[in-house]
Amino acid sequence: MTVSSEEISGILDGVLSLPVKLYSLKVNQRPNHSLIEVVLDNLEHPYGSVSLLECEQVSRKLKEELERISPDLDYTLKVSSAGAERKLNLPGDLDRFRGIPIRLVFRSEESEKEQEGIFRVVNRDGDQIVLEKFQKGKKSVVKKQTTLNLKDILKGNLYVNI
């Protein structure tokens, strides 16, 4: 017996409650076994981190529902947080994580070469995003701002400054 990602997603709709929501879901089907990977997001945490307790609660509830609707299903269930250096869902996460350091890979208008940098989002106006170069530990330095088109951003992740 197998289970689809749509079925799991439907179950999670009934299991999850705000501020915790689904970040991603993967269901890998094998001939006699399913690997179900659920990644969670916390909308109220500055970095979107989900606690171990929240992961356990979702795992327990999802397991109960799976066993109720599909008792013969052979599966492995992994429930986790999206993580501190999660991949950003662009462009929405640029607004959500404004002011928090992010690592961006982008194409500049001057060259087609990929560039990478660590920035803080200052403002977003339509397809334009104003960024401030992140400088670790330097508080009194004049902040250099740059503007990018959203279409030039190839990928982004949160950046944890340790």
UniProtKB/Swiss-Prot annotation:
Keywords: Cytoplasm, Ribosome biogenesis. The keyword Transmembrane does not apply. One of its GO terms (biological process) is translation. It holds the Pfam family RimP_N. GO terms for cellular component: cytosol. It is found in: Cytoplasm. The keyword Lipoprotein does not apply. This is Ribosome maturation factor RimP. It comes from Leptospira interrogans serogroup Icterohaemorrhagiae serovar Lai (strain 56601).
